[in-house]
Regions:
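Active-site loop of short-chain dehydrogenase/reductase
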Residues: 63-64, 109-123, 156-159
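Active-site helix of classical SDR
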Residues: 102, 139, 147
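Catalytic Tyr-X3-Lys loop
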Residues: 73, 80-100, 119, 143
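Conserved Rossmann-fold SDR core element
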Residues: 63, 144, 154-170
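The catalytic Tyr-X3-Lys active-site helix of short-chain dehydrogenase/reductase
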Residues: 3, 97, 126-129, 134-142
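Conserved mid-core segment of classical short-chain dehydrogenase/reductases
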Residues: 51, 55, 74-88, 107, ...
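Alpha-helical segment proximal to the catalytic Tyr-Lys
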Residues: 107, 152-153
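Canonical Rossmann dinucleotide-binding motif of NAD(H)/NADP(H)-dependent dehydrogenases/reductases
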Residues: 1-18
C-alpha cells in the first residue's frame, strides 16, 4: 500500500536492503515491475506463509535487522452492532498479522545476536478512538500493547520495539 511503499523508498534512500511482502498479488506484481528489490507474495495473517517468506529473506540476505510491520484494513461499524466475523477479521488483519511477523522476526534476530528493531504502524485509533471505528481501533489498541510487550520481553537482547502513528496520510485505507 501507500504507506508501505513510501517507507520502502525512505529506507532505500539510506542504503537499506528492503524486502516487500504483500498478500495482494496484483499490487505486488505492479511493484516488482517498478523496483529491483525482492517482493514476496505473503499472507501475513498466516504463520506458515510468514515463515516461508522470512526463510526466503534469510536465504537471500542472511537475516533480518529491522521489521516494519504495516499490515492493516480499516473496518468500521458501531462496536455493539458488528458481527463477530467482522471483528475477528479485523483482529486477524490488524493484530495477528503483526504478531505473526514479529514472532518470526524475533526468532531470527535472537539467533543473529546483533540487536534488531520491530516497528509497528499502530494508528491513532489505538489511543484516540473514533466513532464507528471500534472494529479497527480495538485490534490497533491491542497492537500498541503488543509493541510494548515486545520491548519488555526482548529489550535485554538489544531488540527494540516501537510504534508509529501514521496519521493524516491519504493512503486510501479509509475510503
Amino acid at each position: 500500500g501507500t504507506i508501505g511503499f513510501e517507507t520502502y523508498k525512505m529506507f532505500k534512500s539510506y542504503g537499506a536492503e528492503v524486502v516487500l511482502l504483500d498478500y495482494n498479488l496484483k499490487r505486488l506484481k505492479d511493484l516488482q515491475s517498478k523496483i529491483k528489490d525482492l517482493c514476496i507474495h505473503c499472507d501475513v495473517r498466516n504463520k506458515k506463509s510468514v515463515k516461508k517468506a522470512f526463510t526466503q529473506i534469510c536465504e537471500k540476505y542472511g537475516g533480518i535487522d529491522i521489521l516494519i510491520s504495516n499490515a492493516g484494513t480499516a473496518i468500521n461499524g458501531a462496536i455493539g452492532e458488528v458481527s463477530d466475523d467482522i471483528l475477528r477479521q479485523s483482529f486477524e488483519d490488524n493484530f495477528f498479522s503483526h504478531q505473526n511477523c514479529a514472532s518470526e522476526a524475533i526468532k531470527i534476530m535472537k539467533k543473529q545476536n546483533i540487536n534488531g528493531c520491530l516497528l509497528f504502524n499502530i494508528s491513532k485509533q489505538s489511543v484516540n478512538p473514533g466513532k464507528n471505528f471500534g472494529p479497527y481501533g480495538l485490534p490497533k489498541s491491542a497492537l500498541l500493547s503488543l509493541c510494548k510487550q515486545y520491548a519488555v520481553d526482548y529489550g535485554s537482547y538489544g531488540i527494540r520495539s516501537n510504534g508509529v502513528n501514521a496519521d493524516r496520510i491519504r493512503s486510501g485505507l479509509m475510503n
